[in-house]
Amino acid sequence: MPRVKRGVTARARHKKVLALAKGFRGRRGNVFRIAKQAVMKAGQYAYRDRRTKKRVFRQLWIARINAASRELGLTYSQFANGIRKAGIEIDRKMLADIAVHDKAAFAGIVEQVKAKLAA
């Protein structure tokens, strides 16, 4: 059986890791040993933060809805309760967008919610 030399595969593997580490600061971007660790850590952060992103955006939407509804005299919890009672099925993402970009439409939604809460 002939001897297998690993130079080509090792070079390819190193190139792949260094390509993933492109743009990293200092030796993390150009020394294989350090770049390999940095790429693995970056992958862990990416995996974790893809899940965290969903929570962070939901928090942002709720904060925006809360701020807009407080300007119109309701807390977020009152608004959320009223919107459920009013049967308005708009998700938080859309409500936050409406609250930021179309204040008149959001005010209309809040009026409907207030009417349902008063009834």
From Swiss-Prot:
Purpose of the protein: Binds directly to 23S ribosomal RNA and is necessary for the in vitro assembly process of the 50S ribosomal subunit. It is not involved in the protein synthesizing functions of that subunit.
HAMAP family cross-referenced by the UniProt entry: Ribosomal_bL20 (MF_00382)
GO cellular component terms, semicolon-separated: ribonucleoprotein complex; ribosome
Sorted UniProt keywords: Ribonucleoprotein, Ribosomal protein, RNA-binding, rRNA-binding
The family this protein is said to belong to: Belongs to the bacterial ribosomal protein bL20 family.
The protein's name: Large ribosomal subunit protein bL20
NCBIfam families recorded: rplT_bact (TIGR01032)
Gene Ontology molecular function: rRNA binding; structural constituent of ribosome
Coiled-coil annotated residue ranges, if any: none
The UniProt record lists the keyword Ribosomal protein: yes
TM regions (residue ranges): none
Gene: rplT
Keyword Ribonucleoprotein: yes
GO BP: ribosomal large subunit assembly; translation
Organism: Variovorax paradoxus (strain S110)
Top-level taxon of the source organism: Bacteria
